[in-house]
């Protein structure tokens, strides 16, 4: 992993809560969260969070969103109820 200590990142509080909701499910089924990149898409009534695994050193990309570090999972969370309404594991 590259040294990124001098890079600043930002996540808005309104998205942080949805990340926590998704992470509570993610940690039961996946590996190390530090091996994933999280993408957030704000829809009208839902938030979509995609947890995409990084590539291990020397690993080549494969079709289907899976690497030796885990597999891609997409969470759809209701803005109103703040509950997961759909989970999609990519193959």
Model-predicted segments: where are they?
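Short, non-transmembrane alpha-helical segments in secretory-pathway proteins
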Residues: 1-37
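Short, compact, well-ordered microdomains
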Residues: 67-91
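Hydrophobic transmembrane signal anchors and adjacent membrane-proximal interface regions, especially
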Residues: 10-11, 20, 38-40, 61-63, ...
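Eukaryotic scaffold repeat domains enriched in small/polar residues
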Residues: 4, 23-30, 39-53, 88-91
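Exposed beta-strand-loop-beta-strand "reactive/processing" segments of non-cytosolic proteins
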Residues: 34-76
């Amino acid at each position: 992993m590259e040294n990124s200590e001098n890079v600043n990142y930002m996540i808005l509080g309104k998205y942080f809560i949805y990340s926590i909701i998704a992470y509570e499910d993610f940690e039961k089924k996946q590996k190390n969260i530090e091996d994933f990149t999280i993408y957030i898409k704000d829809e009208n009534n839902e938030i979509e969070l995609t947890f995409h695994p990084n590539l291990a050193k020397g690993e080549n990309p494969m079709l289907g969103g899976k690497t030796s570090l885990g597999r891609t999972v997409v969470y759809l969370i209701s803005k109103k109820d703040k509950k997961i309404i759909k989970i999609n594991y990519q193959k």
